Amino acid sequence: LLRFPGGTVIKTFHWKDGIGPKEQRKAKKNLIWGGINPYHFGTCEFIEYCRELNCEPVLVINISTGTPDEAANWVEYCNGTENTYYANLRRSHGYPEPFNVKYWALGNEEAAEPDAGRHQNPHKYVEDVWHFIKLMKLTDPSIKLIANGESGNKEWTKTALKGLDGAIDYISYHAYVGTNGPSPYSIFQKIQGQDTWMREFAEMVKATVPDTVQNWKKWYRFPHRTAPVKIALDEWGIWEQQEPPYGTTNTYEWRHGLATACFLNAILHNAEHIGMANWAQMVNILAPIMTNSQTSV
């Protein structure tokens, strides 16, 4: 699986800015991480890249500054098969067949106050997200949805789970580890802690929502989930606080490679409950791949 356009950046991302001829796309300031986003890598480029890697795409919806209509139109653009505006728009861009994007995430870290999120109140998140879910699911009932979870706030997550049960298939969990103090080995203790925390998070999910849906309003014109809610570990990685202002430029050393292997082992240890896992980030932010206009390393 590969996740696009990423995490916090989704707060100001609008998918229509990244379709059509590249020379006609409008460059915009990246309000989250700085710099300029020319939108040259948009939906179609991402799908092509996923096909090249032979992986499933995961698209993240902007529920902060976006709208339910915008989200549903993105689903139609990607998966539409009928003679409709956005399906035809995709065809006009050179893609006659649908992309069949299966996984869609309902925002990212929406309770994070420093970011552009506005859902510190989980009840507000549930209320707002339902409008997105309905239009998206009515556009394509087959899609699988990932709701926000707050790995450090179980009560927030419980409220989201209870409020969205039946409609969602995954609950997200984000986990980063780094060195704590002078000892370079402290990172491994943190991974051990994440192993335990993932198990406890999974137990909380199972205790909050039953494996099978118990109550589903018949007037919903789309099906409820048919499997237990699983964890989407859609951000995990190594985060060493370094360069200001965001501390998001990592210099990886041997211990980070070993730590990554240990983290993967912890994920496998909890594989019964984890339905997907995505390394974060991939390019330029906390990334193993760094680029500029001339090269990449």
Give a label for each model feature.
Residues 2, 50, 74, 104, ...:
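Conserved, mostly hydrophobic/aromatic
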Residues 2-24, 44, 62-78:
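Aromatic-lined carbohydrate-binding surfaces of glycoside hydrolases
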Residues 8-43, 48, 83-115, 178-181:
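Aromatic- and acidic-residue-enriched carbohydrate-binding clefts of CAZyme catalytic domains
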Residues 25-40, 56-65, 106-126, 139-151, ...:
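The substrate-binding groove and active-site-proximal loops of carbohydrate-active enzymes
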Residues 28-32, 36-39, 45-48, 127, ...:
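Glycoside hydrolase catalytic-domain groove-lining segments
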Residues 80-100, 207-224:
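Short mixed-charge
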Residues 96-116, 148-149, 157-195, 229, ...:
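Aromatic- and acid-rich polysaccharide-binding/catalytic face
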Residues 226-297:
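Aromatic/acidic polysaccharide-binding cleft in carbohydrate-active enzymes
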